[in-house]
Curated annotation (Swiss-Prot):
The active site is at D192 (proton acceptor). ATP binds at S79, Y80, G81, K98, E147, L148, C149, D153, E196, D210. It catalyses: L-seryl-[protein] + ATP = O-phospho-L-seryl-[protein] + ADP + H(+); L-threonyl-[protein] + ATP = O-phospho-L-threonyl-[protein] + ADP + H(+). This is Probable serine/threonine-protein kinase pdkA. The PIF-pocket is a small lobe in the catalytic domain required by the enzyme for the binding to the hydrophobic motif of its substrates. It is an allosteric regulatory site that can accommodate small compounds acting as allosteric inhibitors. Residues 593-682 form the PH domain. Belongs to the protein kinase superfamily. AGC Ser/Thr protein kinase family. PDPK1 subfamily. Keywords: ATP-binding, Kinase, Nucleotide-binding, Serine/threonine-protein kinase, Transferase. It comes from the Eukaryota. Residues 18-31, 222-257, 268-279, 288-321, 503-568 have a biased composition (Low complexity). Residues 100-144 are annotated as: PIF-pocket.
Length: 686
């Protein structure tokens, strides 16, 4: 493993709380990028000397910077950035460091959600939720120093064994429920709960992570607050000026600040008044849009008009005209990228295979949405397959909305009953719903947990049961029973903050014995859950496993924190497989793929996952494997030189730049050899 020490952090931005001496003031007239960068620094300032709720082990008030860590290999991807292995120089303690580029956050208009993720980490103090230890920043990046989970993710564990036996399934579902119950008690909805976002600690305990799409629900209103809100609504005019005023309020709320901030801080202090952190979202942050002095005056006029209207004052034609004019002025100055903020609470987030029906239909999400995802996870742990999968994302959504799922013919009836009670279309009817008396207690009382000791979860030193496959193989109607192996699947990677790539299948060497068990043991014990190696390739992600372009790797080496991809093997032509069809639009006529695979592309503080493609023309192009967009090309010349750097890393030197790359498949030598081979062949042809 190659260790890379990052030294060129900014002197004033490496850590600590922003002060007037280091942070520029918030000017009302500024450019979008400058204002956003200032807001981002203020919103995501590092911790004070006191630890956060999530981090009881923070030792001192010393301000951390990236210079305090040795940066190692890439572990994976979070919602808005790469995650790398970081070793603290002073203690040699290892962490997972999430690196977020400021300019990327601003460009994608994700400031609000980065703030929310940090706030959720700070609020959460539970053994089954990943801990946040430090946050700090440099001039270019924000850094989250997180608990390292060295055993990968739950999906990796499922793929190792095919499916979980009854005892291991019971234990790990209980740990997920324990962490989920804690989140929901704080009013937190994960909204993207899935096996890839459930990590495994070194001692194989569940750690829920990745809150980039999470949501913090407002605290329930008292009857007095509800009456006040109704009175305010009755005071609003019903004419067009009232509607325009309402729109103006929405437009003015397009800011990185939020009224929810103080409520969240109050909730945090009520959990532990001794724990103090700095304000995570500054109440005085300015909108990220570019404004002028005239527009600022318009904003002031709008606010005055709105206040008068809310107070029940009389409005005349001139006032209505001013409101119309000012609203149009504000709307014209709003960037189109900010409009989604108006409907964020109703927008689609999550991953298609685990998303709940109410999110697809654009209804308001709630904690009950996570219960649907829990049902999908239990189904997958018990069967090895996701319950809902279509050939396209749209068809998957249709299956979810219509609840079209098929159970294995020999699925344990107790587990099936639990899944049935969670995968319910109406959110409030799901087992464990907060809208029903009992809530999570009802879920814990299900017969699946009949002999489970819930109090044992508080003792994390107690080892969990071994993760192992059941005694009999699970069978779906229509499976080819005598096939030596079934296709392996991972869920499609539809979210911006996903961190897992397709890995190879497990082969079942005991199919004939398993088939005999199915025939002879129709009334098998409820403790036996079948094994399955089934899943299918995503149609949305690059697939390089077809034809002679790929060589499968053993699934035992996969990990969510070290995402792996089957690397391409030398193949002189496109063979018409799905891989070739997916990338053909970026190839010229007669151009053939020589080698391709996933790499981590490093440039300064930026770490991006890319699909690198070597062709015979020759060319080296790289593609965003999620968005399926061409991102760039490494310029080819007679002086291009590939060089091996370590077991994972290689460098491609061009006259103007060095490209530092890390092979996700851990075979950088294959890249070096392939490029050298093309260099020789192109030289001989010339």
């Amino acid at each position: 493993m190659e260790n890379i020490v990052i030294t060129n952090t900014s002197g004033g931005g490496g850590g600590g709380v922003p002060s007037s001496s280091t942070d520029p003031p918030n000017n009302t007239t500024t450019t979008t990028a400058t204002a956003s960068a200032i807001d981002l620094n203020m919103s995501l300032s590092p911790f004070l000397s006191s630890p956060s709720l999530s981090s009881p082990s923070i030792q001192s008030a010393k301000k951390k910077t990236i210079e305090d860590f040795i940066i190692g290999k890439v572990l994976g991807e979070g919602s808005y950035g790469a995650v790398v292995l970081g070793t603290e120089k002073e203690t040699q303690q290892q962490y997972a460091i999430k690196i977020l580029e400021k300019k990327q956050i601003i460009k994608e208009n994700k400031i609000k959600y980065v703030q929310i993720e940090k706030e959720i980490f700070c609020k959460s103090n539970h053994p089954n939720i990943v801990k946040l230890f430090f946050t700090f920043r440099s001039e270019q990046c924000l850094y989250y120093v997180l608990e390292l989970c060295s055993q990968g993710d739950l999906l990796h564990q499922i793929k190792k064994v095919g499916s979980f036996d009854y005892r291991s399934c019971q234990y790990y579902v209980a740990e997920i429920i324990s962490g989920l119950e804690h989140l929901h008690s704080l009013g937190i909805v994960h909204r993207d709960l899935k096996p890839e976002n459930i990590l495994m600690s070194s001692d194989l305990h569940v750690k829920i992570t990745d809150f980039g799409t999470g949501k913090i629900l407002p605290p329930p209103q008292s009857s007095q607050q509800q009456q006040q809100q109704q009175q305010q609504q009755q005071q609003l005019p019903t004419n067009s000026s009232g509607n325009l005023s309402s729109l103006l309020n929405n437009v003015n709320n397009l800011s990185v600040s939020t009224d929810l901030t103080q409520q969240q801080q109050n909730r945090t202090s009520s959990v532990d008044s001794a724990s103090t952190t700095d304000s995570m979202i500054s109440p005085n942050l300015q909108p990220t849009t570019t404004t002028t002095n005239n527009n600022n005056n318009n904003n002031n006029n709008n606010n005055n008009n709105n206040n008068n209207t809310a107070a029940g004052s009389n409005t005349n034609t001139n006032t209505n005209t001013n409101i119309n004019t000012n609203i149009n002025a504000n709307i014209n100055n709003i960037k189109t990228t900010e409009i989604p903020k108006l409907t964020r609470n109703n927008s689609f987030v999550g991953t298609a295979e685990y998303v709940s029906p109410e999110l697809i239909s654009n209804k308001e999400t709630s904690t009950d949405s996570d219960l649907w995802a829990l049902g999908c996870i239990i189904y997958q742990m018990a069967s090895g397959r996701v319950p809902f999968r279509g050939k396209t994302e749209f068809l998957t959504f249709q299956k979810v909305s219509n609840r079209e799922l098929v159970y294995p013919i020999n699925m344990n009836p107790v587990i099936k009953d639990l899944v049935e009670k969670l995968l319910v279309i109406k959110p409030t009817d799901r087992l464990g719903s907060s809208s029903t008396p009992g809530g999570f207690d009802n879920l814990k009382a299900h017969p699946f947990f009949q002999d489970f000791n819930w109090s044992s979860l508080s003792n994390m030193s107690h080892p969990p049961p071994p993760i192992q496959p059941p005694q009999e193989k699970i069978i779906f109607d229509g499976d080819e029973l005598f096939s030596p192996s079934l296709d392996c699947t991972t869920p499609r990677n539809n979210n911006v903050d996903e961190n897992h790539q397709q890995n190879s299948c497990n082969n079942n060497n005991n199919n004939n014995n398993n088939i005999n068990n199915i025939n002879n043991n129709n009334n098998s014990s409820s403790n036996n859950i079948s094994n399955s190696n089934s899943n299918s390739n995503s149609s949305n992600n690059l697939n390089i496993s077809n034809g002679n372009l790929s060589t499968p790797r053993s699934s035992s080496s996969s990990s969510s924190q070290q995402p792996t991809q089957r690397s391409g093997s030398s193949g002189g032509s496109r063979d018409g497989g799905s891989s070739s069809n997916n990338i053909s639009k970026w190839l010229n006529n007669g151009e053939n793929v020589i080698y391709q695979g996933l790499v981590w592309k490093r440039k300064g503080f930026s770490i991006k996952k890319r699909q690198l493609i070597l062709t015979d023309t020759p060319r080296l192009i790289y593609i965003d494997p999620k968005k399926m967009e061409l991102k760039g090309e490494i310029p080819w010349s007679d002086s291009i030189k590939p060089k091996l750097k370590s077991n994972n890393n290689f460098v491609i030197k061009t006259p103007k730049r060095k490209y530092l790359l890390e092979d996700v498949a851990h075979n950088p030598q294959k890249w070096v050899d392939s490029i050298k081979s093309v260099i020789l062949s192109s030289g001989s042809s010339n």
